[in-house]
């Protein structure tokens, strides 16, 4: 029985000293039992290393076996000693099972709990409580100890927490005692077992040199071994003994010094012999790292700086985290590739350790970076199962029932690809399934199907209405309907019966049985196994293990649920909460795919000390030292208040350290990380984070840099073409070619810069050589040449061939004028939208087009109903108008396209708003009619053909002998004004936003609608007014803003009706004909002023003015506008038939562009910085300039 300490700083080889002690004792006492204990995290590596050292010591390097020496972690020691003990055979209780049990306890004692009762339903609380219970157990505190702590605490939150903890903890211990074995119980059982053993002749070596702490339970194991006669040797990272007084927090070796002090005092009080301390004296690290160790510990020999740089410590900065990882990878490849005279000096991937304080910032970059560099790696962090598709399937499955088949929930289930239909007894082909699900998703987004629609027996009918649709179902639509109904009926036939049985389940056991049987019968387990096999085929061992581990964890949680809650009524909400908490606490068992791979970890974790090279990435002042945050039920203040009471209890009781203590340990934690390296230590940090915020070196790194006169290197993500040192950018062939391309693109961009002066830029010879080598490589050359060819790529569409034009458009174009406006905005957008017919998928929503259709339909129906009953609009009373409106609106809302307005409470509210708006507009039009001689003659007048609808004659233009264009459209309203023998026709277009006639846009072909409609009226004059009528004149084209205006107090000072008339005033152009204008507004016939209805004013001299909007045009001016509009139509058709598809978006007035709301940006890849991509800037023109230009232009001359 004795206690022995092996001390020394991190630079020393503690294990060498420990193994030497073990060998000496083993030789002297070969029949004794030897245990070498290390943290579980590094057990395997330590076991291999210790056995290798023993083999060397006994002269058997090639083949060595040892039965008397066992290398274990504490929990593995428990298995070894107690595997046949009854106490060790009881069922294990996982983290999920613990959560379930605590959840039931909380519910049972809800009325007794002062604080915890109201927290039961809070997400994460049960898991947080489980952590607190585990901390109490590892601190060797029993329920009666917590009761005593509560009794001694002052009234307040702490006492209430301890009161609740005592109730829950007591019930928890009673519920698990002799029934379940919890993780914390294993060491309790081991301690009890050891107390019954005679350990004389047992030698225990505890290696703690690589880390600083030993939890209270493990300390209890060590002290029990001492009491039972074992010889215990403990290595500690400590450069001096701590005998008389405990160390102060904040000192470098606080944790190990505190442990030394506690164990020494324990042995001294119990008169257990303490042997003379042994110091590890053999350095295990390179000289430069020895110097770093001395400096960090503040040794006298390190007090002055170094003139020569430290050759074992290096640092560099990069422009981003991505570049930082890439540079680390490049260095690793270079070091592995370099061969030395002595093979023992060569590097393997397993010799490298990459660490940072928190891997989150690098997580998404690891895989692409190291895969591209072809570096095998292993991330030494536990990964939660919470995001596995099986977990998503279960959650979404029950959400479907709870939320009544909402779109997102059904899609969540289908997209897990774990529940799939069977075709002829076999699972559906995955690609065919994905296609069917995608089509179904598009359909329900378009139709708004949800709820009971999913479970109806009737087929869903897919339809797609397009221009020219003759109303006949196509084979393509029938096939899409088949695929959609395959998914629809799979859901309808599979889920409702399952949900019905679950609702009828009498208890938890029955419900869980139904769930497992359902998942198994639906082939979920088969799909998981298929995923495993596919991963194995890819040689992805890690991914292959995940499906089975997740299913086993799931089944284990269900077993525990049945054991703990199986006899109680089944509550789906509670069940899902427990499952989710269980999966969040569950993690995959990490399986390295190869023995030779780079290890990636966090500096807060225990690390093996056999890595030759360590990279400390992300070494910024944000994480070195770290910002310590705690999220425990017992706060740091609570723990501080408990320290005095804890010291009065029997035994050793140590709660987890507070944030203050942990912050004090940061220096030691980083010291251990630095000294994990044996040969080289690299510090790196990005200059900026992802948000372009500047990042600074850690003060730790700055101190080291100053002390050792270290040179800082900076690496950029993009190489300098003129720099002859290409080494930072040379890696795998694929990665190197990407940098070669960057160099040549930079050269190309620089040399094509119009503002550049001087000789052309040339790449450094090394880049020319790299390009030649890569493009001539037998295996890689073809790909390299393809990638390099991208340098000559220009983002310019190629003109269509005549054959392509004919295939897309034929010989005749039937079009609306808005399509040609699109052509003038951007030719390529026209090609995508109307040539290739690309479009965004339809969504079941109330769009601007839908509301416009509603307004048009109601106003059309209202005016037609009044005309049918021979009631002039101006003479309709308020009551009459209201009744007609109500009738027409009801009829319109009954139409299928407006069912969306009854699909939800929100839509019902919007329906009321739409009805109010159209009512206001109807009354506004009636009031306008009272002041004007203009009367609505027709509404919704179609010219040209749309599908099966036939209207007036289209506007037909012959382009050449074989090509023509036919323009169609629909005029919202045609007004007629009869003045003596002269008839005038004017058009009104309803708009849901403010519009005016823009001469500039009309000139450039961006706003041709109104002029085209006027032209259509002229071409269909006889059909509109009859052949017996004298020639009509065009009155003009006006916009009416459909709105329910908000009026301010100042607006209604002149009267409410006058304010509404002003808000609904027409905008557009009118014929500058005094005879016409006089009859448009009766209020101005005898006086002067501005019209309340139309966009003109009458001056005192009786003449008329269009004001700033230049809304009055002469007959000649109108004719020129119409002629120019026709020329634009012809010019657009000529360009389309010629195959023109230029990427030429317009930019108007230096702000408005054709790309602002385009859905095709990702296809066009337009970049104004590229020489070949530029906006087509249209010079601003006033109305006068446009009219003057038209006057001077000759017929057929290009409008630009």
Swiss-Prot record:
Its EC number is 3.1.-.-. It comes from the Bacteria. One of its GO terms (molecular function) is helicase activity. Keywords: ATP-binding, DNA damage, DNA repair, DNA-binding, Exonuclease, Helicase, Hydrolase, Nuclease, Nucleotide-binding. GO terms for biological process: double-strand break repair via homologous recombination. Heterodimer of AddA and RexB. Despite having helicase-like domains, this subunit does not have helicase activity. Belongs to the helicase family. AddB/RexB type 2 subfamily. This is ATP-dependent helicase/deoxyribonuclease subunit B. It comes from Lactiplantibacillus plantarum (strain ATCC BAA-793 / NCIMB 8826 / WCFS1) (Lactobacillus plantarum). The gene is rexB.
